[in-house]
């Protein structure tokens, strides 16, 4: 259920249910100092309220997973199917984000339970998945790292991709040939990322190094 301010009212306790991962939004980058005084570059992630919206089982759905939902929608933006599916989780009018984490079913998990930020702890090694920044249409030099031609005055080409054909046989462009095209805006996964700090009161998670995507990008963290 949601109150007059649009904030979610959860039915679970303060701790919530712990899963093998969670979802958070990228806020930006910063740096913190380690125990030995070293400066550690970190990405700041903010976790909102996520509620369990469905428990998928291998017998019924073909695989085990916990479906989660967050950020309530307005009634005008929701379909009847969405309202019916998420009503049991406490969303009267659907949710902007509906995601899932594949894992074994935790004991005692119920619809409407809040996901605990303690699902991820300091020192954990996680797999980070998010949507990379979209760069628009890009040439082969920027998109694939082609060397390009000489930068001399006498050169007739500089950043052109060059010949893409072949000989008489096969007489066609082979599948997978690298061409100019849309760069970015694709799902990227970074593995072996260390969790530097977790601040439960603020809903903040600090992970070492950069995370793909722009600010406010939804990020999935799963324990390795």
PLM segments and residue spans:
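Extended basic (Lys/Arg/His-rich) segments that typically form rRNA-contacting surfaces
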Residues: 2-224
């Amino acid at each position: 259920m949601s109150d007059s301010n649009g904030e979610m009212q959860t039915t679970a306790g303060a701790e919530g249910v712990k899963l093998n991962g969670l979802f958070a939004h990228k806020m930006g980058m910063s740096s913190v100092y380690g125990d030995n005084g070293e400066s550690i570059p970190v990405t700041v992630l903010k976790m909102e309220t996520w509620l369990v919206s469905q428990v998928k089982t291998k017998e019924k759905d073909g695989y085990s997973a916990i479906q989660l939902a967050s950020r309530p929608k307005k009634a005008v933006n929701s379909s009847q199917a969405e309202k019916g599916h998420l009503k049991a989780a406490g969303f009267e009018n659907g949710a902007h984000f509906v995601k899932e984490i594949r894992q074994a079913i935790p004991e005692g998990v119920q619809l409407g339970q809040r996901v605990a930020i303690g699902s991820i702890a300091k020192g954990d090694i996680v797999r980070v998945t998010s949507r990379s920044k979209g760069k628009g249409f890009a040439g082969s030099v920027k998109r694939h790292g082609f060397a390009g031609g000489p930068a001399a005055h006498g050169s007739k080409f500089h950043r052109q991709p060059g010949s893409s054909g072949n000989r008489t046989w096969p007489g066609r462009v082979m599948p997978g040939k690298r061409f100019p095209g849309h760069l970015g805006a694709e799902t990227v996964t970074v593995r072996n990322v260390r969790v530097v700090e977790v601040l439960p009161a603020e809903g903040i998670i600090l992970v070492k190094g950069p995370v793909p995507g722009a600010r406010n990008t939804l990020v999935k963290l799963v324990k390795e």
